[in-house]
Regions:
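C-terminal capping/extension of enzyme domains
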Residues: 2-17, 39, 84-99, 122-167
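Short, hydrophobic/glycine-enriched beta-strand segments
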Residues: 17-23
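Short, glycine/serine-rich, charged loops/turns that create anion-binding
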Residues: 25-28, 78, 117, 140
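Short, surface-exposed acidic-centric catalytic microdomains
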Residues: 28-89
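Alpha-helix N-cap/helix-start and coil->helix boundary motif
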Residues: 41, 117-118
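Residue-level signal for well-ordered alpha-helical scaffold segments within enzymatic catalytic domains
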Residues: 45-49, 100, 104, 123
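Internal catalytic-core helix/loop-beta-alpha segment
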Residues: 68-116
Length: 167
């Protein structure tokens, strides 16, 4: 078990309306200092399909995709004890200052990528924000029961239901 501190800056603009939250960056994401960096993680391809866009390949393209659709991206946790990338191993979770992030934008909806991030958000952050979260299926390769197309369909349905960006 390793003590991990979140060091990746959130992707956000003052126009962001929907905040997408993971739990804590994986070792590969921490190594590359960018979100969902593990090559088997399907977040970026699923989000691009959901938004009817080509899959971004560079960090700059990924940031542009998020901002173009008035989204924001961060993680629930600032620090925790964790084994590898196993969300189920998390101990001593400390949340990021999500209320302060929300205050600098137009965020009015929160999406969590998986049940662990949703559980931690609901317990540690919701009491301050009062914004309930919607749970997206985990994009992790460990969620093998869902094909990429299924993930994209769920992401699209949820984002379209929440966002004025599609109006």
């Amino acid at each position: 078990m390793e003590h991990v501190i979140h060091t990746i800056s959130p992707i956000i603009s003052p126009q962001s309306e929907i905040l997408i939250l993971g739990t804590m960056p994986s070792p590969k994401s921490r190594e590359q200092a960018f979100y969902y960096a593990h090559p088997q993680n399907r977040f970026w391809p699923a989000l691009a399909l959901a938004l009817d866009e080509a899959a971004p390949t560079s960090q700059a393209e990924k940031i542009a995709l998020i901002l173009r659709h008035r989204l924001a991206l961060w993680d629930v946790l600032y620090s925790c004890e964790i084994t590898g990338a196993s969300d189920s191993s998390i101990k001593n979770p400390v949340p990021n200052d999500i209320p302060a992030l929300i205050a600098q934008s137009q965020i009015h909806r929160v999406l969590c990528t998986g049940t662990t991030s949703a559980r931690l958000y609901t317990r540690l952050v919701f009491p301050q924000t009062k914004i309930p979260c919607e749970v997206l299926p985990s994009p992790s390769a460990a969620n093998a029961r869902m094909r990429l197309e299924d993930l994209a369909r769920e992401y699209k349905k949820t984002i379209q239901n929440l966002s004025s960006a599609f109006l």
